[in-house]
Curated annotation (Swiss-Prot):
Protein name per the record: Calsequestrin-1
Record-listed Phosphoserine modification sites: S81, S216
Subcellular location: Endoplasmic reticulum; Sarcoplasmic reticulum; Sarcoplasmic reticulum lumen; Sarcoplasmic reticulum membrane
Keywords: Calcium, Endoplasmic reticulum, Glycoprotein, Membrane, Metal-binding, Mitochondrion, Muscle protein, Phosphoprotein, Sarcoplasmic reticulum, Signal
Modification type Phosphothreonine: residues: T124
Name of encoding gene: Casq1
GO molecular function, one term: calcium ion binding
Any one biological process term the GO annotation gives: endoplasmic reticulum organization
Amino acid sequence: MRATDRMGARAVSKLRLALLFVLVLGTPRSGVQGEDGLDFPEYDGVDRVINVNAKNYKNVFKKYEVLALLYHEPPEDDKASQRQFEMEELILELAAQVLEDKGVGFGLVDSEKDAAVAKKLGLTEEDSVYVFKGDEVIEYDGEFSADTLVEFLLDVLEDPVELIEGERELQAFENIEDEIKLIGYFKSKDSEHYKAYEDAAEEFHPYIPFFATFDSKVAKKLTLKLNEIDFYEAFMEEPVTIPDKPNSEEEIVSFVEEHRRSTLRKLKPESMYETWEDDLDGIHIVAFAEEADPDGYEFLETLKAVAQDNTENPDLSIIWIDPDDFPLLVPYWEKTFDIDLSAPQIGVVNVTDADSIWMEMDDEEDLPSAEELEDWLEDVLEGEINTEDDDDDDDDDDDDDDDDDD
């Protein structure tokens, strides 16, 4: 489904190995008693993950409402590869244990031994988790940890459209700002236009939340007319109405596909690879900012203002990463990008080799203004700032070193 390199070929193995330790580090130490209500699950030793093959795959699919399959290449004979595969299995086993009562099953499909089954199921990308629910197939493009995978699958179990029926639910809807969201106003669940909307929602579930209301009072507060659908870009206050209501499923899907890359979007554990692979000409504009930190919050607010002022520019897309969401990756990012993530940063990253160049802050105590940030972004979009310039500087430094040796 996705053939692009994930954060660079060399970066992938390190990144994935780091993510695998989440399960181990997140498990309470043995001998430490948790209070009632805070008893974290520990693997009970029961094998629940199924090796799916040509003989059993039909029965496996009949057994579970939702089935998550890890499509993997055969582990190599060396100790490190064997250990890594065991850890991946353990992550799936713990997730299977937690979700056993929810009717969620887990399986393994070997890309060599079970190639025929993989072909029938449409599995194409090794080391990916494919989730099957009814007629829908969802590729999980998130962090490979038990907690994140469980959270994702719980979302999969939810209905693709959430109904807004009162003031509190409306307030909760309005508080969602860090992801795309849609809301439509329809006569009832039996409306053919609502059913088209629901079918469209299934295409993006659970990555993009779809909401609907049948309440005229709620619709009035949202300035929605009957059968009208509003699309909210992430971090944008004002929606865009999908034109030519009432809309068919195909029209809704097409509109979302065309507009799903927000001007400012947040890297999230449950969709990190999907976001990273959606680059513009092989690069990302990346901003690091801790929302809980005063400087990070101020910088993020400036980013939001710049994004809102430039939302009509299809060439501008900024990925915001909150380091607090990825503590295990902070040392890796600091080393790879040669930056200090204790302070806000913004730069350009080449997705192929992770080469990067970062905005110089004139004064560490004075963060860039919206105008300064816009000027820098304009230089990036015009190609005046790019990672190749940084390579040239490195070459010059190497030449200087050679001269010193002479």
